Structure formats: C-alpha cells, structure tokens
Amino acid sequence: MLDQRKIRENPTLIEKGLARRGLKVNLAPLTEASERLKGLEQHRNSLQAKGNLIGKEVGQKIKSGISPNSEEVVSLRSKGNELKREINVLEEEEKALAKSIRKRILNYPNIPYSECPDGKDENDNLQIRNWGNPLKGEGYKEHWEIAEELGLLDTEKSVRIAKSRFVTLFNHGARLERSLINFMLDIHTSKGYSEVLPPVLVNTASLEGSGQLPKFAEESFKCSEDDLWLTPTAEVPLTSLHRNEVIPFEKLPIKYVAYSPCFRREAGSYGRDTRGLIRLHQFNKVELYWFVEPKKSKEAHQIITADAEAILQKLELPYRVVELCSGDLGFSASCTYDLEVWLPGANSYREISSCSNCDDFQARRSFIRTKKGNQTQLVHTLNASGLAIGRTMAAILENGQQSDGTVKLPKALVPYFGENQLTPQ
C-alpha cells in the first residue's frame, strides 16, 4: 500500500510514479480527504487534552475539600462529559473516513524504483543475461505431445473430473512432479530457508495484505459461504505469517520456502496455452519469501533471484533473466526480474519464475514492522518462484527429448526420481 503521508505531502511525485505504469491518476480528492482526516485527528487530540485538564482539575478540587456535588465540580464534570460525546462523534467520523481512504489507496499499485526501466509492456523489458545453450532447429516436439506419448498425463479425464485447464498426472508424470518438489525444497533449505507448509485456503485480509485484493478478485476462486479463497500463490500466506507483528530486528532476514498448490481462474487468458502444463487453474509451485530490513532489500533481491536461477542451472535448463519495465510490473512490485526458460518445442522463452522486490508495499498493507532500539519501521518483503513445477516439467520434457521417444533427465534429479530417463508407460 502506498504511504498516505507521502500522498498528502507530495501527490505530484506519486502521480508521476503511477504514470510510469501507464496509470493516469488525479490524487487531489484523496489528498483532500487525507488532509481532512489529519484535521479531525488534531481536533480530537485537542479535545482529549482539554478533557484531561478538566479531569485533573476535578480531582484537585475534590482533594482540596470541595464537595463532589458542588455546583463548581458538577459544572466541570458536565463539560467533561460533553467533550467525551464530541470525541466519540469525531472518532466515528475518523474511522469512516480512514476506511474510505484505505479502500481507495488499496487500488493503487506500487511505485517503480527509479532504476526500473521505463516502458509500456513486455516488449520494453530489458534482457540482463542468459545461461546455457538453447536447442534450436526443426523437429522438436512441444511438451504436451511428449507427455501424452509417454503416458504422463490425461487432460480428457481431468475435464470429466473438473473442467478444462486442469490436468491429471500418472505414473512417471506424478513421480516427476513429486521429485521436482522435493529437489527444490532440499536445495533451498540447504541455503538457509525455513520450510513452511501453509494453508491453501486464505482469508480476505491475507489477500489484501499481499496485494492480490481488490485488484485480482476476478482471477481468484472464492468459497462463497466463507471468508476464504483458494490461494493463487504461497506468497499470500507467507506474507501473513507476520501480519500485525513487530519482528525483532535481530531475527532479520527471515527466509521462507514453501511448496503449495496454487489456484487461478485465468479469466483473461481465453484461447492461450490451452494444452499442456503452462497455464492451468491448479498448479504446484515452490515459493521463496524474504522479510528484510529496508536498506538491505536491493541486495536481497539479487540473492533471491540467484537462488531461483540455481535451480534452473542444476537442472541444466537454458534460460534468460529479464528486468521488467515499469509498465509490465506486477501490482505489488517495485522491481522484478523474470526468469524465462527456453522451450525448444515451442521455439520460445517462457516465464518460469518472477523475482520481485516489493519494498514496504506489502508490509504497510499487512502492518509488518521491525524494531531496533527505540526505532520501529516497516520491513521490506521479497518473493520469487523457486520454481513453478508444471513449467519446470515442461522444460525438462522439451529440452531432454531424445530421438527414440524417451526423455533424458538432468543428473541432479536422478537421485530423486530413481531413473535417468522417462520411457513410455
């Protein structure tokens, strides 16, 4: 969430930051409401100070021997009670106005860092580096063809069970999924991440805190009879692990890794990636999440990105790192690196991980602070996919495909899978 004080004190700067995302916003009404709220708070504080003085004066008079029923004391108490009524009215007005302001601010995305390249969309993203040697040429099959030939998955049965954009994995497909999850968790925990297995149902406050709501309500599955939603990413429950908390400074940084099923309606992707494992309503993902002190978040961003890259390197999958331009940033991010894995069958790079620094945006929405000495401040949060399991499987199938119809598995995965190749089932 954007800082209300910064909006009030320098709305033009915030408007320019949002304009870099392609949003034309007039913050004048919000600024006026914020100034009014500040005025109400000051007026209430003034009345409370007067009330405290009256209470003190009443106590002194009674202590000096004046009767509590005297006209003088009764008059003072009457004034005090009147002030309390005024204060109660002001408090209700403040609450209503503060709620209205928060509701408006929740709709605004994070401001891009000054270092973030300007641009409108993915076409303006900046390639930072690449790794590995992409397989290029004719004759490479797409992952869904390979998976069907090997008997790894069945989409028709999934439609019967649920609907389109779901997949059921069988035999080597199910084992490969499980192997990848365990492999990724082991690599990340060996680097100091604490493993978490969070709920897949989360409440509205958790989704608001991470920045998923209200923006992405139509993209999420909701349980209509409860205040619960199927989580679109483990980033949501991981953020809320410390919602409304003060984290002791000496405990920072906190690094979590979590495997979680993820659920998305994909409302805006009609006709895209209708086959295979790239775009599903339900998919598995391993998520990395950091809570850090503000001055170290940019350094942490490089580390969390490298940790996600390490998985691709160990799996021998060619990829590139792309810095997102201001117009392509996710809602909560101030800076993002996408890792895009090479798929020779599709003859293209596809996103497999998004590594974002959200600075204090999520922490302000979730009220997550740290305290060092007498100073309390918001933490910074970072997240990265480490990695999306289905897309990783797709990349392994396409990059490991052999002329005899088998798929060669990366050496690092063999101890987890138990065999060095996938064969027809």
From Swiss-Prot:
E.C. designation(s): 6.1.1.11
Keyword vocabulary terms for this entry: Aminoacyl-tRNA synthetase, ATP-binding, Cytoplasm, Ligase, Nucleotide-binding, Protein biosynthesis
Pathway: Aminoacyl-tRNA biosynthesis; selenocysteinyl-tRNA(Sec) biosynthesis; L-seryl-tRNA(Sec) from L-serine and tRNA(Sec): step 1/1
Classification via Gene3D superfamilies: Bira Bifunctional Protein, Domain 2, Serine-tRNA synthetase, tRNA binding domain
Subcellular location: Cytoplasm
Pfam families linked to this entry: Seryl_tRNA_N (PF02403), tRNA-synt_2b (PF00587)
Binding locations of ATP: R264, R265, E266, E351, I352, S353, S354
Zinc-finger found in the keyword field: no
Comment field on protein domains: Consists of two distinct domains, a catalytic core and a N-terminal extension that is involved in tRNA binding.
Protein name: Serine--tRNA ligase
Disulphide linkage map: none
